[in-house]
Amino acid sequence: MAVRLLRVASAALGDTAVRWQPLVGPRAGNRGPGGSIWLGLGGRAAAARTLSLSARAWSSSEDKITVHFINRDGKTLTTQGKVGDSLLDVVIENNLDIDGFGACEGTLACSTCHLIFEDHIFEKLEAITDEENDMLDLAYGLTDRSRLGCQICLTKAMDNMTVRVPEAVADARESIDLGKNSSKLE
């Protein structure tokens, strides 16, 4: 079994803080799709986004844009994010109080970061992937302008945009109830 250490940046400790995280399992450190690192977890493998400290970690306020989130309760949460960061990163890094948002931490395994975009912004977004589309099919309140926040990275053209959080959240990871189909072993 392989064991490697992964150097990761910790947003909670500040932009320049670094810590080491052990990777264990037969596939530890193997590269997966898109250059992600596969983490061995109890015999199962899970993809994790690789984090690196780059020039954008020390970006100036000129590289930040303003984003307005209309929360489920109708209140507007205004914050700033770095160009290149995903909307999920913006919510996490700014500790925005959006209940249940980003439960899978951006691994395309839930749909809790479902957002609804303004027409003029939606038209400029990169094409949706099949994987994102599959997750969106499970989202609550799906519209023709829906996307997952973990898949949308900020650009300068998005400055001052408003995105709406749907009224309810559906976590695709909880859509299958195995308890009802399980038989009791005696």
Swiss-Prot record:
Free-text comment on the cofactor: Binds 1 [2Fe-2S] cluster.
Residues with the Phosphoserine modification: S61, S175
Molecular function per GO: 2 iron, 2 sulfur cluster binding; electron transfer activity; metal ion binding
Any single GO BP term: electron transport chain
UniProt keyword terms in alphabetical order: 2Fe-2S, Acetylation, Cholesterol metabolism, Electron transport, Iron, Iron-sulfur, Lipid metabolism, Metal-binding, Mitochondrion, Phosphoprotein, Steroid metabolism, Steroidogenesis, Sterol metabolism, Transit peptide, Transport
GO CC annotation, single: mitochondrion
Subunit structure: Interacts with CYP11A1.
Annotated protein name in UniProt: Adrenodoxin, mitochondrial
Organism: Sus scrofa (Pig)
Gene field: FDX1
